[in-house]
């Protein structure tokens, strides 16, 4: 069993967030002794799922719906799987977008490092758009997809 302060430290979440989740009903079996909340491994796993879904872009109301489905048992397996498939797809799309952004950022770092070394952009511009060094060309191409 863990106190709210311990869980806050474990997950890097403010205590206020944990209280909010509790108030929203995410921890229906949370043990209380006096005014102190005690989190079991079940609550920790629920918190991992909440944070995973939240980081995937799902809103709290939709995360609550997931937990309603969990309470329905095996009859909601398909809905839960579809939710996770959709979130996985959304995260994969976001990763692709970020990879494109990262490629362009890396290209521009090389671009300005080279321009500073040369004192101008002439040699770089002469190589654009398709005569760059191979590794830099890949970054340029990915960033300009």
Q: Where are these predicted regions, by residue range?
A:
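Short, charged recognition helix plus adjacent turn
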Residues: 64-86
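Residue-level recognition of short, well-ordered coil/turn positions
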Residues: 26, 58, 74-75, 120
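Residues at alpha-helix boundaries and short interhelical turns
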Residues: 54-57, 74, 95, 99
């Amino acid at each position: 069993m863990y106190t709210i302060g311990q869980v806050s430290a474990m997950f890097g979440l403010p205590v206020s967030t944990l209280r909010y989740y509790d108030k929203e009903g995410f921890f229906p079996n949370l043990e209380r002794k006096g005014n102190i909340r005690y989190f079991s491994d079940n609550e920790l796993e629920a918190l991992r799922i909440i944070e995973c879904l939240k980081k995937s872009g799902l809103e709290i109301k939709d995360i609550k719906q997931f937990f309603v489905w969990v309470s329905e048992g095996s009859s909601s397996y398909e809905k839960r799987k579809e939710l996770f498939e959709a979130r996985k797809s959304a995260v994969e799309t976001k990763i692709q977008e970020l990879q494109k952004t990262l490629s362009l950022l890396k290209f521009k770092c090389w671009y300005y490092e080279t321009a500073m070394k040369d004192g101008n952009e002439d040699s770089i511009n002469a190589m654009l758009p398709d005569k760059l060094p191979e590794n830099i060309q890949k970054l340029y191409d990915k960033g300009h997809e």
